[in-house]
Amino acid sequence: MNIRGAPDLGQPSDDPNSGGERERIRQRMKMVIGQLEGILRELKEVAKELREVVSQIDKLTSDFDFELEPDDWTTATVSSTSSSDKAGVGGPFDLGHLDFMTADILSDSWEFCSFLDVSTPSDSVDGPEAPRPGTGPDYQLMNGGLPIPNGPRVETPDSSSEEAFSAGPAKGQVPQRTPGTRERVRFSDKVLYHALCCDDEEGDGEEGEEEEEGDLAPELPRVEPHTGPLKPSPAPYKTKRSPLTTRRLGPTLAPEQTRRVTRNSSTQTVSDKSTQTVLPYTATKQKAKGKN
């Protein structure tokens, strides 16, 4: 096919346009080859200049004596040597000409190894290291993170028990107890206490109400002496009030123990309230039956 798209019937192509394109392609190829030859000439000139610079550096540094100190030799410098340096008489492991295994070169490494030998005990010769006298185990109590050595101590209360409010162990306390058993019972008592009382902050108000109810309790039997058998006698109030009043008035108790007594007696105060609230309701009901 010719350029115009007509089929070629075997006639020789005498079109002048095809010859012109070939000439243009040849000229472009010659121009590219000329540019490449120019680039090669420039690279050769740059190489010559670099050689001259290196020779000048050698001349300038010929007066200096570069001697490496023994401490500067490391394993990295030995491993980074070329294959031509390694190919010696003794093979790649021949380091005699470097003097690498001398004591001066390995002074720092030997000192470091001796430091490790001193700091680290040997298992075969020294044996197990003896514990230092006067020191306990390194672990600490989980109760507040106090730096106290852990152990079977009686005066160490659990965080969930009410014994944490007291200053020390009571006189009648058991010397040895299993940790966890008594504290669980105390925790259940505290849950019952929270179920009966609204808040712990109302302890002062409950104490005031307890004193007022203690004064009003003996007057209830005088007003209504004909109540039924559900009415309690004044004796239980005296028995419940007497230890509390004696404990509060006792000068020998510590403030922490007083706080513990008030917290333990708060549940009794709630039970007294419940029994006292039932009494007037029962009395009015019986009066209504009497009127009918």
Swiss-Prot record:
Coiled coil stretches, renumbered: 30-63
Disordered: region residues: 1-25, 120-292
UniProt keyword annotation of Coiled coil present: yes
BP GO annotations: chemical synaptic transmission, postsynaptic; inhibitory postsynaptic potential; postsynaptic specialization organization
GO cellular component terms, semicolon-separated: GABA-ergic synapse; postsynaptic density; postsynaptic specialization
Biased composition, class Basic and acidic residues, residue ranges: 180-192
Biological role: Component of the protein machinery at the inhibitory synapses, probably acting as a scaffold. Inhibitory synapses dampen neuronal activity through postsynaptic hyperpolarization. This synaptic inhibition is fundamental for the functioning of the central nervous system, shaping and orchestrating the flow of information through neuronal networks to generate a precise neural code.
Recorded family membership: Belongs to the INSYN1 family.
Complex and partners: Interacts with GPHN.
Protein name: Inhibitory synaptic factor 1
